[in-house]
């Protein structure tokens, strides 16, 4: 048997030189400009996916589905998408609230074997488009970034190679380091991930 999922989204820019192919029957949506759809996917689908990966890993959840079925993390993912959605000029005819709920349903699908560690592992280079872009847009508009900031903090904690139970993952620490170094080179800086000592917040 083949495991599938009900979620589908296939958007194609309507620019064909020899006539448009008849792909409507398989669910293709032809649009004049795919950029709004790409931005929507990056900031909503990918941003929430990364959020669940970082925070889910830190909370000890092995899979994205397990993280999404945690009431608290699901609420955070919804909040991240709500903050990000406010930075979008949504594609015409797209109900962003319905789209966000369809993503939550997809993330909760236990038949999808995506692990939090796998999704989080290559996220450092993707963070600017997924989380930092909407965060900056909200800051520029004078809006709060409480949950987007939490997602970014989750990435920072993940980069230390430890979860919230203080279990060290050498493999993750080693794998994440080259991405941090790559980012540092772009900004002519050096990266040192320092642990925050235990104790009450200051």
Language-model segments: what does each one mean?
Residues 1-202:
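Substrate/ligand-engaging "lid" and interaction regions
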């Amino acid at each position: 048997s083949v495991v599938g999922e009900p979620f589908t989204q296939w958007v194609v820019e309507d620019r064909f030189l020899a006539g448009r192919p008849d792909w409507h029957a398989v669910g293709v949506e032809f649009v004049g400009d795919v950029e709004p759809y790409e931005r929507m996917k990056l900031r909503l689908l990918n941003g929430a996916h990364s959020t669940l990966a970082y925070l889910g890993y830190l909370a000890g959840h092995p899979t994205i589905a397990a993280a999404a079925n945690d009431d608290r993390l699901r609420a955070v993912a919804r909040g991240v998408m709500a903050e990000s959605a406010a930075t979008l000029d949504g594609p015409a005819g797209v109900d962003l609230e319905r789209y966000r709920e369809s993503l939550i349903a997809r993330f909760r699908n236990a038949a999808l074997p995506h692990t939090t560690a796998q999704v989080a592992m290559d996220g450092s280079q993707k963070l600017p488009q997924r989380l930092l872009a909407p965060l900056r847009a909200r800051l520029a508009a004078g809006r709060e970034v409480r949950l987007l900031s939490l997602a970014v903090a989750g990435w920072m904690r993940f980069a230390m190679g430890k979860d919230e139970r203080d279990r060290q993952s050498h493999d993750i620490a080693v794998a994440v380091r080259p991405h941090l170094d790559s980012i540092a080179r772009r900004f002519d800086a050096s990266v040192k991930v320092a642990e925050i000592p235990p104790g009450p917040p200051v």
